[in-house]
Amino acid sequence: MAQPHHFIRITTCKLLYGRVPKAANSSIKAALCRLLSERPPQGTKTTSDKFWQHETNNETELITLRKARKYRRSHFSFSFVRNPFDRLIAAYNNKVIEIEQPPLPMQHMGIHHDMSFESFLDVLIDTPIQRYDVHVLPQSHLLCLGRQVIPKFVGRVEQIDEHWDILRNILLREGINVMESLPQKNVRRSEKNSLKEYFHNDSLINKALQLYSDDVNLFYNDTSIDNLINNAPLPQITPLQSRSLKLSSWLQDHVFNR
Protein backbone atom coordinates (compact mmCIF):
# COMPACT_ATOMS: atom_id res chain seq x y z
CA MET A 1 0.00 0.00 0.00
CA ALA A 2 1.28 3.48 -0.90
CA GLN A 3 2.20 5.58 2.11
CA PRO A 4 -0.39 8.32 2.81
CA HIS A 5 0.62 11.96 2.51
CA HIS A 6 0.00 13.13 6.08
CA PHE A 7 2.48 16.03 6.19
CA ILE A 8 2.02 19.53 4.79
CA ARG A 9 5.25 21.11 3.57
CA ILE A 10 5.28 24.90 3.25
CA THR A 11 8.14 25.50 0.86
CA THR A 12 8.45 29.26 1.35
CA CYS A 13 9.35 29.03 5.04
CA LYS A 14 10.67 25.46 5.26
CA LEU A 15 7.97 24.26 7.63
CA LEU A 16 6.43 20.79 8.00
CA TYR A 17 3.13 20.10 9.76
CA GLY A 18 2.18 16.52 10.63
CA ARG A 19 -1.60 16.39 10.34
CA VAL A 20 -3.55 14.49 12.99
CA PRO A 21 -7.31 14.49 12.29
CA LYS A 22 -9.40 15.28 15.39
CA ALA A 23 -6.44 17.05 17.03
CA ALA A 24 -7.08 20.73 16.19
CA ASN A 25 -6.17 19.92 12.59
CA SER A 26 -8.66 22.36 11.01
CA SER A 27 -7.63 25.19 13.35
CA ILE A 28 -3.93 24.66 12.65
CA LYS A 29 -4.53 24.60 8.89
CA ALA A 30 -6.44 27.88 9.18
CA ALA A 31 -3.47 29.40 11.02
CA LEU A 32 -0.99 28.10 8.43
CA CYS A 33 -2.99 29.73 5.64
CA ARG A 34 -1.74 33.07 7.00
CA LEU A 35 1.77 32.06 5.90
CA LEU A 36 0.76 31.91 2.23
CA SER A 37 1.63 34.87 0.02
CA GLU A 38 -1.98 35.01 -1.19
CA ARG A 39 -4.90 34.46 1.18
CA PRO A 40 -7.41 31.88 -0.07
CA PRO A 41 -10.63 33.37 -1.48
CA GLN A 42 -13.49 33.51 1.00
CA GLY A 43 -15.33 30.22 1.11
CA THR A 44 -12.29 28.13 0.10
CA LYS A 45 -12.23 24.77 1.86
CA THR A 46 -8.76 25.05 3.36
CA THR A 47 -9.15 21.73 5.18
CA SER A 48 -9.14 19.75 1.93
CA ASP A 49 -6.14 17.88 0.58
CA LYS A 50 -6.87 19.37 -2.84
CA PHE A 51 -6.28 22.90 -1.52
CA TRP A 52 -2.87 22.16 0.03
CA GLN A 53 -1.69 20.08 -2.93
CA HIS A 54 -2.97 22.13 -5.88
CA GLU A 55 -4.36 25.54 -4.89
CA THR A 56 -1.54 27.41 -3.11
CA ASN A 57 0.53 28.54 -6.10
CA ASN A 58 3.08 25.78 -5.48
CA GLU A 59 3.86 27.14 -2.00
CA THR A 60 2.80 23.88 -0.34
CA GLU A 61 2.69 20.17 -1.01
CA LEU A 62 1.48 17.05 0.76
CA ILE A 63 4.25 14.58 1.53
CA THR A 64 4.69 11.18 3.14
CA LEU A 65 6.34 10.37 6.46
CA ARG A 66 9.37 9.07 4.61
CA LYS A 67 9.75 12.27 2.63
CA ALA A 68 9.17 14.34 5.79
CA ARG A 69 12.10 12.52 7.38
CA LYS A 70 14.31 13.57 4.46
CA TYR A 71 13.30 17.21 4.90
CA ARG A 72 13.76 17.11 8.66
CA ARG A 73 17.29 18.54 8.66
CA SER A 74 16.39 21.54 6.52
CA HIS A 75 12.85 22.20 7.82
CA PHE A 76 11.23 22.76 11.21
CA SER A 77 8.52 20.16 11.81
CA PHE A 78 5.66 20.07 14.31
CA SER A 79 2.39 18.39 15.19
CA PHE A 80 -0.25 18.24 17.91
CA VAL A 81 -1.75 15.11 19.47
CA ARG A 82 -4.90 14.47 21.51
CA ASN A 83 -5.91 12.23 24.39
CA PRO A 84 -6.42 8.96 22.44
CA PHE A 85 -9.67 8.14 24.27
CA ASP A 86 -11.08 11.60 23.56
CA ARG A 87 -9.95 11.53 19.92
CA LEU A 88 -11.58 8.12 19.42
CA ILE A 89 -14.90 9.37 20.79
CA ALA A 90 -14.69 12.50 18.63
CA ALA A 91 -14.24 10.33 15.53
CA TYR A 92 -17.11 8.05 16.58
CA ASN A 93 -19.53 10.91 17.25
CA ASN A 94 -18.63 12.90 14.16
CA LYS A 95 -18.29 10.11 11.60
CA VAL A 96 -20.70 7.46 12.90
CA ILE A 97 -23.44 9.23 14.87
CA GLU A 98 -23.76 12.77 13.48
CA ILE A 99 -23.75 11.97 9.75
CA GLU A 100 -25.96 9.53 7.84
CA GLN A 101 -23.11 7.87 5.96
CA PRO A 102 -19.60 7.43 7.38
CA PRO A 103 -16.69 8.17 5.01
CA LEU A 104 -16.15 5.47 2.40
CA PRO A 105 -12.98 4.10 4.03
CA MET A 106 -14.98 3.56 7.23
CA GLN A 107 -17.81 1.92 5.29
CA HIS A 108 -15.27 -0.42 3.70
CA MET A 109 -14.14 -1.32 7.22
CA GLY A 110 -17.72 -2.34 8.07
CA ILE A 111 -18.62 0.78 10.05
CA HIS A 112 -22.17 2.07 9.62
CA HIS A 113 -24.30 4.92 10.90
CA ASP A 114 -25.57 4.71 14.48
CA MET A 115 -23.71 1.51 15.39
CA SER A 116 -22.93 1.09 19.08
CA PHE A 117 -19.62 2.33 20.44
CA GLU A 118 -18.58 -1.19 21.46
CA SER A 119 -19.38 -2.54 17.98
CA PHE A 120 -17.33 0.32 16.54
CA LEU A 121 -14.38 -0.73 18.71
CA ASP A 122 -14.80 -4.37 17.67
CA VAL A 123 -14.66 -3.41 13.99
CA LEU A 124 -11.44 -1.47 14.59
CA ILE A 125 -9.89 -4.43 16.40
CA ASP A 126 -10.84 -6.81 13.57
CA THR A 127 -9.62 -4.53 10.76
CA PRO A 128 -5.99 -4.55 9.54
CA ILE A 129 -4.34 -1.19 10.21
CA GLN A 130 -3.65 -0.78 6.47
CA ARG A 131 -7.41 -0.40 5.89
CA TYR A 132 -8.05 2.20 8.60
CA ASP A 133 -9.71 5.51 7.84
CA VAL A 134 -7.32 8.34 8.75
CA HIS A 135 -9.64 9.61 11.51
CA VAL A 136 -9.09 6.44 13.54
CA LEU A 137 -5.45 5.73 12.69
CA PRO A 138 -3.24 5.73 15.80
CA GLN A 139 -1.37 9.00 16.14
CA SER A 140 1.91 7.08 16.34
CA HIS A 141 1.22 5.74 12.83
CA LEU A 142 0.71 9.27 11.56
CA LEU A 143 3.83 10.73 13.19
CA CYS A 144 6.36 7.90 13.58
CA LEU A 145 8.38 6.02 11.01
CA GLY A 146 9.58 2.76 12.47
CA ARG A 147 10.93 3.73 15.89
CA GLN A 148 11.40 7.40 15.00
CA VAL A 149 9.22 10.38 15.93
CA ILE A 150 9.37 12.56 12.82
CA PRO A 151 8.14 15.99 14.06
CA LYS A 152 10.69 17.91 16.10
CA PHE A 153 7.90 19.41 18.23
CA VAL A 154 4.76 17.58 19.42
CA GLY A 155 2.27 19.59 21.48
CA ARG A 156 -0.94 18.42 23.13
CA VAL A 157 -4.44 19.66 22.31
CA GLU A 158 -5.39 19.62 25.99
CA GLN A 159 -2.68 22.26 26.60
CA ILE A 160 -2.90 23.89 23.21
CA ASP A 161 -2.86 27.52 24.36
CA GLU A 162 0.37 27.04 26.30
CA HIS A 163 1.98 24.72 23.75
CA TRP A 164 1.00 26.88 20.77
CA ASP A 165 2.64 29.84 22.50
CA ILE A 166 5.84 27.81 22.96
CA LEU A 167 5.72 26.72 19.32
CA ARG A 168 5.08 30.28 18.15
CA ASN A 169 8.17 31.54 19.98
CA ILE A 170 10.29 28.76 18.46
CA LEU A 171 9.00 29.61 14.98
CA LEU A 172 9.64 33.32 15.52
CA ARG A 173 13.30 32.47 16.10
CA GLU A 174 13.18 30.67 12.74
CA GLY A 175 11.73 33.80 11.12
CA ILE A 176 8.22 32.30 10.85
CA ASN A 177 5.39 34.42 12.26
CA VAL A 178 2.21 32.44 12.94
CA MET A 179 -1.00 33.62 14.62
CA GLU A 180 -0.83 34.36 18.35
CA SER A 181 -3.83 32.12 19.02
CA LEU A 182 -5.56 29.44 16.99
CA PRO A 183 -9.00 30.05 15.46
CA GLN A 184 -11.72 27.77 16.79
CA LYS A 185 -12.68 25.35 14.03
CA ASN A 186 -14.97 22.30 14.15
CA VAL A 187 -15.39 22.44 17.93
CA ARG A 188 -18.30 20.13 18.74
CA ARG A 189 -18.40 18.33 22.05
CA SER A 190 -18.14 20.64 25.04
CA GLU A 191 -18.63 18.23 27.94
CA LYS A 192 -15.19 17.72 29.42
CA ASN A 193 -16.26 14.78 31.57
CA SER A 194 -18.24 12.89 28.95
CA LEU A 195 -15.68 10.13 28.33
CA LYS A 196 -16.95 8.02 31.21
CA GLU A 197 -20.29 7.40 29.56
CA TYR A 198 -18.44 5.61 26.76
CA PHE A 199 -15.69 3.92 28.76
CA HIS A 200 -17.89 2.69 31.58
CA ASN A 201 -16.24 -0.70 32.08
CA ASP A 202 -12.79 -2.29 31.92
CA SER A 203 -13.61 -4.24 28.77
CA LEU A 204 -14.19 -1.08 26.74
CA ILE A 205 -11.07 0.57 28.15
CA ASN A 206 -8.96 -2.49 27.35
CA LYS A 207 -10.30 -2.61 23.79
CA ALA A 208 -9.29 1.01 23.26
CA LEU A 209 -5.86 0.31 24.73
CA GLN A 210 -5.48 -2.68 22.41
CA LEU A 211 -5.75 -0.14 19.59
CA TYR A 212 -4.06 2.94 21.00
CA SER A 213 -1.66 1.90 23.77
CA ASP A 214 1.32 3.20 21.76
CA ASP A 215 -0.29 6.64 21.63
CA VAL A 216 -0.83 6.61 25.39
CA ASN A 217 2.70 5.38 26.13
CA LEU A 218 4.41 7.83 23.82
CA PHE A 219 2.42 11.04 24.21
CA TYR A 220 0.59 10.66 27.55
CA ASN A 221 2.92 8.60 29.72
CA ASP A 222 2.97 11.29 32.43
CA THR A 223 -0.62 10.65 33.52
CA SER A 224 -2.87 7.69 34.37
CA ILE A 225 -5.49 5.94 32.28
CA ASP A 226 -8.10 7.04 34.84
CA ASN A 227 -7.08 10.66 34.36
CA LEU A 228 -7.38 10.32 30.59
CA ILE A 229 -10.82 8.72 30.90
CA ASN A 230 -11.89 11.49 33.30
CA ASN A 231 -10.39 14.17 31.06
CA ALA A 232 -8.57 15.42 34.13
CA PRO A 233 -6.08 18.30 33.82
CA LEU A 234 -2.70 17.11 32.59
CA PRO A 235 0.63 17.83 34.27
CA GLN A 236 2.34 20.96 33.03
CA ILE A 237 5.09 19.71 30.74
CA THR A 238 7.29 21.02 27.98
CA PRO A 239 6.02 19.58 24.67
CA LEU A 240 7.89 16.56 23.32
CA GLN A 241 10.81 18.01 21.40
CA SER A 242 13.45 16.11 19.46
CA ARG A 243 16.11 17.92 17.46
CA SER A 244 17.59 14.74 16.04
CA LEU A 245 16.20 11.46 14.82
CA LYS A 246 18.74 9.75 17.06
CA LEU A 247 17.02 11.33 20.08
CA SER A 248 13.55 10.54 18.76
CA SER A 249 14.57 6.89 18.36
CA TRP A 250 15.80 6.92 21.97
CA LEU A 251 12.43 8.30 23.09
CA GLN A 252 10.59 5.55 21.22
CA ASP A 253 12.81 2.78 22.56
CA HIS A 254 12.56 3.95 26.17
CA VAL A 255 8.82 4.65 26.07
CA PHE A 256 7.51 1.72 24.04
CA ASN A 257 9.82 -0.84 25.60
CA ARG A 258 9.20 0.03 29.25
Where are these regions (language model features)?
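Membrane-interface amphipathic segments in extracytoplasmic regions
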Residues: 1-258
